[in-house]
UniProtKB/Swiss-Prot annotation:
SUPFAM superfamilies: LexA/Signal peptidase, Winged helix' DNA-binding domain. This is LexA repressor. It catalyses: Hydrolysis of Ala-|-Gly bond in repressor LexA. The keyword Disulfide bond does not apply.
Amino acid sequence: MIKLTARQEQILNLIRDAIENTGFPPTRAEIAAELGFRSANAAEEHLQALARKGAIEISPGTSRGIRLRDMGGTRSDRSGAQLSLPHPALMQLNLPLVGRVAAGSPILAQEHIEATYNVDKSLFSAKPDFLLKVRGMSMRDAGILDGDLLAVKKIDSAKNGQIVVARLGDDVTVKRYKKTGSLIELLPENPDFQPIRVDLEHDDFALEGLAVGLMRTWN
């Protein structure tokens, strides 16, 4: 077991809770606000200490680039009690990996399936239905990078602020969702990209799923 200070354990539980509830880790600013730090730099110092101890991995250059590492079998709740985790063999999912999506065809059509991954379902905030290979860097500041595998749960509707997989005409995109009346904005997490605006009365739009987690592969 990795030995952590009380503050480090608090931050680690905060990261876990954020991933469980939203599918994504918190930003440094969010950690600082939650724990009453004066600046995001204080949160960064604690994150670096957690990384040195092997509790997390940090991806440079992204505000949400925090990855939990397996610390072996237990975690603490807010009262400090130790909670047992299910055995990994009982927590496996077989998820199809969707690559490029052909225009006009269902996202889970057989020709889009590049592979099948056997993964631990405890990695995700909700049970996903498929993995989508991310193309491009428009969601960089949410910690979603080109080539990442986004875990997606199929949905019919979404809440403002959630990260979704959306189909607009013949294109499939990953963006943050915002709806006002019949107008939808698909918001990037990178200032180099512009929002996509959708008029439901005129545009061909559909939600393909909700992002519930992320996997990164290294060559």
